[in-house]
């Protein structure tokens, strides 16, 4: 979107966290006040007459809280849902979290942190996939059985979806086309 001239704020970059149990591997997050200072700077540079694009599934990014006034505005703002095939999303996650494929102990700890939410046999299956380096099956299972259902419950409490942009895959050409499609949506 930014490459096509859209305004956006990358909340995950400001929070130095990717926003899930797997998201905090690059080091410590900034203090809440530092995040808010960065956010204020990013918002000050925006044109209020133009749409602003944000991504957030939750009011919390790691240990950082999105300020209440911004979160409230986000909850009431028009939403665009972008969908993609599970296998393509899995490949993207494997690339994004490549550091985990080389750190079995860290990956195991993160999977163990899901124990309060899933049956022991599900955790054992994910642990076995991680140990066998079956990262595509692991990523697909985590999305299908953990993240997607949580995301669906979370989004059900927010404003209605203004548009759905389905992607056939996550190739550069498809992403550019999707960005153009998003920017052409009226009322957003």
Segment roles from a protein language model:
Residues 1:
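Hydrophobic positions on the alpha1 helix immediately C-terminal to the Walker A/P-loop
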Residues 4-73:
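Conserved nucleotide-sensing/catalytic segment adjacent to the nucleotide-binding pocket
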Residues 72-79, 83-188:
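Conserved NTP phosphate-binding and transfer environment spanning the P-loop NTPase/kinase superfamily
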């Amino acid at each position: 979107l930014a490459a096509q001239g859209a305004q956006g704020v990358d909340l995950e970059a400001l929070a130095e966290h990717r926003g899930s149990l797997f998201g905090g591997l690059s080091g410590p997050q900034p203090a809440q006040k530092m995040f808010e200072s960065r956010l204020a700077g990013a918002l000050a540079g925006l044109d209020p007459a133009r749409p602003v694009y944000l991504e957030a599934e939750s009011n919390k990014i790691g240990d950082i809280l999105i300020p209440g006034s911004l979160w409230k505005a986000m909850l009431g703002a028009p939403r665009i849902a972008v969908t993609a095939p599970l296998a393509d999303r899995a490949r993207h996650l494997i690339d994004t979290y490549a550091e985990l494929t080389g750190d079995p102990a860290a990956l195991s700890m993160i999977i163990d942190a899901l124990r309060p939410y899933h049956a022991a046999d599900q955790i054992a299956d994910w642990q076995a996939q991680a140990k066998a380096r079956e990262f595509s099956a692991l990523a697909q299972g985590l999305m299908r059985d953990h993240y997607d259902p949580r995301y669906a419950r979370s989004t059900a409490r927010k404003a209605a979806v203004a548009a759905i942009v389905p992607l056939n895959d996550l190739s550069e050409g498809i992403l550019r086309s999707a960005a153009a499609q998003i920017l052409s949506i009226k009322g957003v």
